[in-house]
């Protein structure tokens, strides 16, 4: 599924049009993580190429240890954990599962030109977002969804978009029920004093 281009083509033919229709054609930013690269690649290509949303910002949500942040921001597929003397068996040392790599998949490579920005999300912030979404919105989401949500906050902050009315779409791609033994185990251990009271405290 990493190299099979039917992956991104399905999202080009189905997910992209679904988002475009449900948002009444009004989308300013789309945010997703990269696992195979199929979701972000297919949706980005559909919105930018087929619907000609040239002003749309497409952003990658990247966990710590993954190389896509530097690939998008600086053109180099690299993370500091790869430097000489720091290589380890489990390269992507993060609680976040399902997204983040240190290689370019075909699904990502053929659609890279449609991606604009990337945000590096630390485990701590993803865990805080998980608790925030559960406590305030009743959403029990997994780790990949939570780094996507964190990237929304980063994007809004970087471009000073608070109260702008911009339409930002992110993918809630996994349920917390599939992350009970690792991610949510840590999320539930966050002390009450460390929980955030507003999204402004998150990033």
Annotate the PLM regions.
Residues 1-2, 33-35, 60-62, 169-173:
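Short beta-strand segments
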Residues 33-44, 68-69, 144-152:
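Short glycine/serine/threonine-rich phosphate/pyrophosphate-binding segments
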Residues 10-55, 61:
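Glycine-rich ThDP/TPP pyrophosphate-binding loop and its adjacent helix/strand module
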Residues 3, 49-143, 182-203:
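Active-site/ligand-binding loops adjacent to catalytic centers
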Residues 23, 47-51, 155-160, 187:
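Active-site catalytic pocket residues across diverse enzymes, especially alpha/beta-hydrolases
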Residues 125-128, 133, 149-160:
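A short, acidic, amphipathic alpha-helical segment used as a generic capping/interface helix at domain edges
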Residues 1-18, 142-147:
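A glycine-rich, Thr/Ser-enriched phosphate-binding loop motif common to dinucleotide/cofactor-binding enzymes
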